Structure formats: structure tokens, C-alpha cells
Amino acid sequence: VNIAAALANFGATVVVIDLDPQGNASTALGIDHHGDIESIYDVVVGTTEFADTLRQSPENPLLWCSPSTLDLAGAEIELVSMAAREYRLQRSLERFLSSPPGAAVNYIIIDCPPSLGLLTVNAFVAAKEVMIPIQCEYYALEGVSQLVRNIDLVKGHLNPGLTLST
């Protein structure tokens, strides 16, 4: 979220996708993510187009968010039976980016849950680059090797253009 805010402060149009059911990125951006709003959940399950979920941050007119809602917590179970489940977010973003509002976006940042399920796989398939923000402590570093292995698997099978930034 801090990187998104900094980019927007320097004049870039930034979209944050809050793919974490806890919704902390939405909260940090001042976006309501309670109740019956259209959210990234609706995009992932295929009931809403991505552009319809975007909310402008009150902090900066160049900063937008596709918020999380509690519905996202059940999305992993719903995705299991869906066709092309790993590509749902990617396909929605491709449609958005080829439209006039999407063409104006400079950066899309996806905030992922701290798990390696289908929501995170959707993010990796949709992304061009992965950045792993972690604290330099033992428990935080413990899961990085598994995360890097999963990124390599996604790169090998689903998104060959995916890079891991340093």
C-alpha cells in the first residue's frame, strides 16, 4: 500500500487489488469494504467486470482500489470447481486494460493473502512481477523458500513471463 501511495503521489495512476480476505489494503486506502459492495470477489467468481469494482481512494485521486470483502474468504472453495480457475483474475484484467479506463492505469499492485491457495495463484498468473515484502526475522523468512518454489511452478506452467524482483 505504501508503494502504491508513493507512486500515486509522484503522478502515476495506480490500482490496488485487495485479494486478501482480511481487507487490510482496502482499509489502509480508506475504502469501504463492508456490506454489499461490488468487490474483487465478484470479479474472481465471474459476476462483475473489474472496472465496476474500482473505488477511488479519498487520499489521492490517482489511487484506486478493488476492495476485498468477507465473501472472498470462501472464494477458494468456489474456485475449485470453476473452469480455468487459475486464469480468472488475469482474463478480467486483460479486458480492463484493453478498455479506455484501463489504458490510463500505470501500475496495478495486488495485495495477496499470506497463503499459497488459488487466490494467490490467480495473482501470480495475472502478474508480471512478484515482490515479497517481509520482515527480516526467522519466522518470516521460514516460508520464503516455499513461496519461491510456488512462484517457479507458476512460472513454469502458467505464466512464463513472471519475474521475482529483488
List the model feature ranges, each with a label.
Residues V1-T166:
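P-loop NTP-binding core
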